[in-house]
Amino acid sequence: MAGWDLFGWFRDILSSLGLWNKHGKLLFLGLDNAGKTTLLHMLKNDRLATLQPTWHPTSEELAIGNIKFTTFDLGGHLQARRLWKDYFPEVNGIVFLVDAADPERFNEARIELDALFQIKELDNVPFAVLGNKIDSPSAVSETELRAALGLMNTTGYTKIEGQRPIELFMCSVVMKSGYSEAFKWLSEYI
């Protein structure tokens, strides 16, 4: 679709939902090499860049439509995962990326995701789980990823009182597809 403006689309959607001029704190989490920094860079600059692994937490101010987000890219290597808990206070949403083309690491991703689900402080925080790299020939299907991560019964677009909002979105950051739906979904909870 030539000339399609992703950011204009976000602005229009958020305006229609009454989410103009809101502010939220988002954490970008997931294992190393899942695409967290690439996604953040794409959202901020609308282009790809050659990136190195994230060794230290980085913070960016990001506006999608009229919602301003303070985003934290915390890195996914083992040492960085120990710091994730330091960023939980006052978080409004978590974007958890999984490399859908690396099934050998699904169990590790599930362990980290399940550990996050057990943290009382995050009980009401929405989780947008992104199965990234669907452009890769080795990427698994959404059904396979849901099963591997234990996400067969997510909340979808239904707000259920007393239940944490969780949804899985399949995407390709490099192809600029799939992740906009995740941010639209997250915006309904901020």
Swiss-Prot record:
Q: What does this protein do?
A: Small GTPase component of the coat protein complex II (COPII) which promotes the formation of transport vesicles from the endoplasmic reticulum (ER). The coat has two main functions, the physical deformation of the endoplasmic reticulum membrane into vesicles and the selection of cargo molecules. SAR1 controls the coat assembly in a stepwise manner. Activated SAR1-GTP binds to membranes first and recruits the SEC23/24 complex. These SEC23/24-SAR1 prebudding intermediates are then collected by the SEC13/31 complex as subunits polymerize to form coated transport vesicles.
What superkingdom heads the lineage? Answer: Eukaryota
| PROSITE patterns from the UniProt entry | SAR1
User: What are the leading ranks of the lineage?
Assistant: Eukaryota, Fungi, Dikarya, Ascomycota, Saccharomycotina
Q: What Gene Ontology terms describe what this protein does at the molecular function level?
A: GTP binding; GTPase activity
One Pfam entry name: Arf
Organism this protein belongs to: Kluyveromyces lactis (strain ATCC 8585 / CBS 2359 / DSM 70799 / NBRC 1267 / NRRL Y-1140 / WM37)
The record's subunit annotation is:
COPII is composed of at least 5 proteins: the SEC23/24 complex, the SEC13/31 complex and SAR1.
Q: Which SMART domains match?
A: ARF, SAR
Reaction catalysed by this enzyme = GTP + H2O = GDP + phosphate + H(+)
Query: Which Gene3D superfamilies does the record cross-reference, listed alphabetically?
Result: P-loop containing nucleotide triphosphate hydrolases
Name-wise, this protein is Small COPII coat GTPase SAR1
Please state where this protein is localized: Cytoplasmic vesicle, COPII-coated vesicle membrane; Endoplasmic reticulum membrane; Golgi apparatus membrane
Entry GO CC: endoplasmic reticulum membrane; ER to Golgi transport vesicle membrane; Golgi membrane
Gene designation: SAR1
Q: Which UniProt keywords apply?
A: Cytoplasmic vesicle, Endoplasmic reticulum, ER-Golgi transport, Golgi apparatus, GTP-binding, Hydrolase, Membrane, Nucleotide-binding, Protein transport, Transport
Q: Does the keyword Endoplasmic reticulum apply?
A: yes
Entry binding sites for GTP: 30-37, 73-76, 132-135
Primary location class: membrane
Q: Which SUPFAM superfamilies match?
A: P-loop containing nucleoside triphosphate hydrolases
Q: What is its EC number?
A: 3.6.5.-
Say yes or no: keyword GTP-binding present.
yes
Protein family (similarity comment): Belongs to the small GTPase superfamily. SAR1 family.
Q: Where is the signal peptide?
A: none
* GO annotation terms (biological process): intracellular protein transport; vesicle-mediated transport
> Which InterPro entries does the record cross-reference, listed alphabetically?
P-loop_NTPase (IPR027417), Small_GTP-bd (IPR005225), Small_GTPase_ARF/SAR (IPR006689), Small_GTPase_SAR1 (IPR006687)
Q: What class of enzyme is it?
A: hydrolase
Please report the record's description of how this protein sits within the membrane. Peripheral membrane protein
